[in-house]
């Protein structure tokens, strides 16, 4: 019987969801702590059978979003997200609302961390091809996905499955460059998965 894998609601460039059936069977049968060293959209780490999972990524907004998913129930995430979408008048065609929210996210000094995280994910859902992209100054710069990207029932189902699974695993979030990760604490049955960005390509995550 084929394994049914959970799909991340984050369309991170280089995500491995479509080839999980080729990757995960190569992992050890027993893993105490699984380290997803370049966590990204977390398609691999969320689907690994391990006692503990460490999500590591150098992009802080991603780490904060993954942590938010882990700390909230799926109902809370969905309800808060839908309220935020409505508050910001986002839809498939409202370019002005998207640009206004993107400008707010890039320049507003947030006093409420949850508001910042929800704004970030709301932007992703209405960005071109749901892509996550920052410039060298860490300003979010993905364009509007007019008539292409939006929050919909499929997205809602993905969020629910993903967050429900996250709530069931023992997860730790790490915000380190891979060279700064403390490998000295790893033990015999721990496993590190490395899928680094493709620095010699023109992928959007290299902008």
Predicted regions and their residues:
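Short active-site oxyanion
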Residues: 30-33, 51-52, 168-171
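S-adenosyl-L-methionine
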Residues: 1-39, 43-44, 48
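Conserved proline-anchored active-site loop of SAM-dependent methyltransferases
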Residues: 23, 34-48, 55-60, 121-128, ...
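Conserved SAM-binding loop
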Residues: 66-67
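Short, surface-exposed loop/helix-turn segments at secondary-structure junctions
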Residues: 205-207
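Conserved N-terminal glycine-rich FAD pyrophosphate-binding loop of Rossmann-like flavoproteins
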Residues: 70
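Short alpha-helix immediately C-terminal to the canonical SAM-binding loop
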Residues: 63
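SAM-dependent nucleic-acid methyltransferase catalytic core
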Residues: 2-18, 74-193, 197-202
